[in-house]
Design a protein with these regions (language model features):
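Acidic/histidine-rich catalytic cores of soluble enzymes
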Residues: 31, 36, 63-64, 158-279
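Short, acidic/polar
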Residues: 44-56, 111-121, 210-217, 282
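Conserved, mostly hydrophobic/aromatic
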Residues: 56, 64, 87, 123, ...
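Active-site acidic/histidine proton-transfer and metal-coordination neighborhood
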Residues: 11-19, 23-28, 86-89, 105-200, ...
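Boundary/entry segment of secreted carbohydrate-active catalytic domains
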Residues: 27-47
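N-terminal secretory signal peptides
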Residues: 1-3, 16
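Catalytic domains of carbohydrate-active enzymes, especially glycoside hydrolases
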Residues: 51-69
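Glycine-rich, proline-tolerant flexible connector loops at the mouths of alpha/beta enzymes
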Residues: 65-84, 138-139
Length: 329
């Protein structure tokens, strides 16, 4: 079939609108910039780091929070320089590290500070300036000892002071099963650390599962937030196990018949959902961010990707575009 020149030119006039619609589900990354967490791909053995970066590029999540530092370099058979190159060629950024080396043992003080320094030196090479600090897990020795909580707060002040000398900020990541998980523990911690030295890097799912008012907590500590996780969740009683779906490879393509979830399942993991599928009030959170003029990263930390990382991050990106960006870009 022949197409007239007039028809061809007319079709060209529609191209910008078509392209705009095609891109409309990709987050704008203006005031709020969106990141993924490397942790998810630990549930997809054999994934190459370049596959992960391609998912980020194609779904509009240009940042990554690194996990398992420094061991992830060996796990993914990549050097720091190679990672820098692969990120740069795709226009992506390493934005922080999930830092799990905080110790309440006074004898470990210097090693703890040295480990924090190493993590921030690594991040500085990528232009990052924030360290996400996890409190010690309750299964670690010494966390229930008298004075342990105070020792943790003291160490965080020291980490925050160190961060300031390196041009960094540091903030606490609340987490179930760790020393800081409930509203009372968060309040106690935030009151004990120096607000000039140490901030808050909240996780919405862990707030929700701990029974917190998510929007209220973000609003309460908004002046101390430099980084946060948007992660959706349902309380266990409201979260029946999802029906088994075909597994998906790291790039979102079908890869067998087993459910695409971590081996062995797990109660906590099954309470985590794509943005908008759970109970967290993200529009409320976003209105707080708008009110404070937040400019920074939000990590959409998927602990499970039932349809595969590519498909689930596309779903999350669509939620960001359709539900959150009308509130605040």
């Amino acid at each position: 079939m022949k197409i007239s020149r007039r028809s061809f030119l007319a079709s060209l006039s529609l191209l910008p609108a078509v392209l705009a619609r095609a891109q409309s589900q990709v987050p704008a990354n203006k005031n709020v910039k969106w990141a993924v967490s490397l942790n998810l791909w630990g549930y997809f053995p054999g994934t190459k780091i370049t596959d992960i970066l391609d998912v980020m590029r194609d779904t509009g999540f240009p940042g990554i929070r690194l996990t398992g530092f420094p061991g992830f370099l060996n796990k993914y058979s990549i050097t720091q320089a190679q990672l820098h190159t692969e990120l740069s060629k795709r226009g992506l950024s390493a934005v922080t590290i999930s830092w799990n080396s905080l110790s309440v043992d006074p004898a470990m003080r210097q090693q703890t500070l040295d480990n924090a320094r190493d993590a921030m030196k690594f991040l500085a090479d990528f232009g990052a300036n924030h360290l996400v600090v996890f409190s010690p897990g309750l299964n670690r020795g010494g966390t229930a000892a008298p004075g342990a909580f105070e020792e943790m707060c003291k160490r965080c002040n020291e980490i925050g002071e160190l961060a300031g000398t390196m041009g960094f900020t540091a903030g606490l990541h609340n987490h179930m099963g760790q020393m800081v998980q409930t509203r009372e523990q968060i309040d106690q911690f935030m009151a004990a650390v120096d607000p000039k030295l140490f901030g808050f890097s909240p996780d919405t799912a862990h707030l929700h599962l701990a029974g917190c008012d998510v929007v209220g907590m973000i609003d309460k500590y908004k002046s101390r937030i430099k980084f946060l996780d948007y992660k959706d969740a349902k309380l266990p009683a409201a979260a029946p196990a999802p029906a088994a779906a075909p597994a998906a490879a790291a790039n979102g393509t079908a890869a067998g018949t087993a459910a695409a979830r971590p081996a062995g399942g797990g109660g906590f993991i099954q309470n985590i959902y794509d943005l908008g599928d759970g109970e967290v009030d993200f529009p409320g959170c976003h209105r707080v961010l708008k009110g404070m003029g937040y400019k920074g990263w939000i990590c959409v930390d998927l602990d499970i990707a039932r349809l595969g990382p590519m498909a689930d991050y596309k779903r999350c990106g669509a939620y960001v575009v359709n539900k959150l960006e009308p509130i605040y870009l």
